[in-house]
Amino acid sequence: MDAFIRVANQSQGRDRLFRATQHACMLLRYLLESKADKEAVVLKLKRLETSVSTGRKWFRLGNVFHAIQATEQSIQAADLAPRLCLTLANLNRVVYYICDTVLWAKSVGLTSGVNREKWQRWAARHYYYFLLLSLVRDLYEILLQMGQVARDRAKREKSSRDPPKYSVANEETEWLQSFLLLLFQSLKRHPPLLLDTVKNFCDILIPLNQLGIYKSNLGVVGLGGLISSLAGLLTVVYPQLKLKAR
């Protein structure tokens, strides 16, 4: 209950709750729309999804300023690669939220003469760039973690009296097994990096579908959005799980 109250008291937490509900409705709608006796349920889910999506717009109006603040913070990162990736990513996020705000103003009748399709493409494109750059940053962090795990393993093997086991029969697959083991151990020892990677990977399915780069069905987009929203909620409930800039 305390965790729920903490989430509800934060605008980002409320937005992620609404987003999780929206994508859960999308996923359920995809699973039920092929069933002949579920038309009424599907219609209710669609109405709820639309209502939640409209409600989210109010929480997202202040996200432009939050993205600007995140850009200022990313410029101060000590490591060059994360600083470059995060700064460019957050600049694209600022543009995305500006486009999203214009679309919201158009939907409520505050502006006229706005080409909805053009602004939607711009929003999807900059959202895609933001997520792509965020994933590049995640990949950089993963490679650093894998290097650290490999060095730690080498130290243990050097101090051990037993030499590492080697089999010629497994030579062809040894590199793949070693890589996957390093990847697993690296993400296991760094949960914030795992959460951020999963969240960004699931999120990027949305602009990929909108831009026609990789077409997905409603179920895939809904499932990806739901997983991403739940991962985001975890970082709100447990701030220590949020990936920090170096």
Swiss-Prot record:
Positions in the Cytoplasmic compartment: 1-93, 239-246
Lumenal compartment spans: 115-217
A GO biological process held by the record: regulation of peroxisome size
Tissue specificity comment: Strongly expressed in liver and at lower levels in heart, brain, kidney and testis.
Subunit structure: Homodimer. Heterodimer with PEX11G. Probably interacts with COPB2 and COPA. Interacts with PEX19. Interacts with FIS1.
Induction record: By ciprofibrate.
Keyword Disulfide bond: no
Subcellular location: Peroxisome membrane
A Gene Ontology molecular function term of the record: protein homodimerization activity
Phenotype of gene-disrupted mutants: Mice have no detectable defect in constitutive peroxisome division and display a normal peroxisome proliferation response when exposed to PPARalpha-activating drugs. However, they are defective in peroxisome proliferation induced by 4-phenylbutyrate (4-PBA).
Protein task: May be involved in peroxisomal proliferation and may regulate peroxisomes division. May mediate binding of coatomer proteins to the peroxisomal membrane. Promotes membrane protrusion and elongation on the peroxisomal surface.
Name listed for the protein in its UniProt record: Peroxisomal membrane protein 11A
Gene that encodes it: Pex11a
Lineage, top ranks: Eukaryota, Metazoa, Chordata, Craniata, Vertebrata
Bilayer disposition of the protein: Multi-pass membrane protein
Any one GO cellular component localisation term in the record: peroxisome
Family listed: Belongs to the peroxin-11 family.
